[in-house]
From Swiss-Prot:
One of the primary rRNA binding proteins, this protein initially binds near the 5'-end of the 23S rRNA. It is important during the early stages of 50S assembly. It makes multiple contacts with different domains of the 23S rRNA in the assembled 50S subunit and ribosome. Forms part of the polypeptide exit tunnel. It comes from the Bacteria. Part of the 50S ribosomal subunit. The keyword Magnesium does not apply. Belongs to the universal ribosomal protein uL4 family. Pfam families: Ribosomal_L4. Keywords: Ribonucleoprotein, Ribosomal protein, RNA-binding, rRNA-binding. InterPro entries: Ribosomal_uL4, Ribosomal_uL4-like, Ribosomal_uL4_dom_sf. Residues 62-73 have a biased composition (Basic residues). GO terms for molecular function: rRNA binding; structural constituent of ribosome. This is Large ribosomal subunit protein uL4.
Amino acid sequence: MTNLTLDVQTAEGTTNGSVDLPAEIFDREVSVALLHQVVNAQLAAARQGTHSTKTRAEVRGGGRKPFRQKGTGRARQGSIRAPHFTGGGISHGPKPRDYAQRTPKKMIKAALYGALSDRARNERIHVISELVPGQAPSTKSAKAFIERLTERKSVLLVIGREDINAQKSANNLPGVHILAADQLNTYDVLNSDDIVFSVEALHTFINRATGAAQEEQN
């Protein structure tokens, strides 16, 4: 594993130094099976699980036998709320449930690092000093800058939580998804063609990742 070095791009079209991407985060082996498991678990946990149907015991009415047992020539019936009646209860229908799956933190971290490594190897990670020059938000400037970085349509923009200027500038751009460094996850990385980090967000993410690794070793 080797550290990767990326130039820091500016909104003016120049470079402002470079940053190193640690190999333990951005040059890891990719396990497709692990990515699949973690993404499925993340999507499952996002489900509300509030779906609910009524059984024959919960549907209003149907307490009286609709007609006598014998002598009508019809099949015997005990309630008009049985599942085979229109307006009857639902048999084996969905009930509220929790879809969350237990996924170990080490697996979640390994999947995220694998997804980032895949994007880094394919030169789909970019680092910028700031999205928009100056103090005023500008969607036009943000759009032009991102289009200069990549021609692909789906972009994940990772910025600092306090970078309100960048948030307002990119909030309405189609194909651009905004996350803070501590919100970075496997699904959003894989769902985007390119990842654009601000220098601040990149350092925050790396510090959190390396700090957590040191705590685990201790």
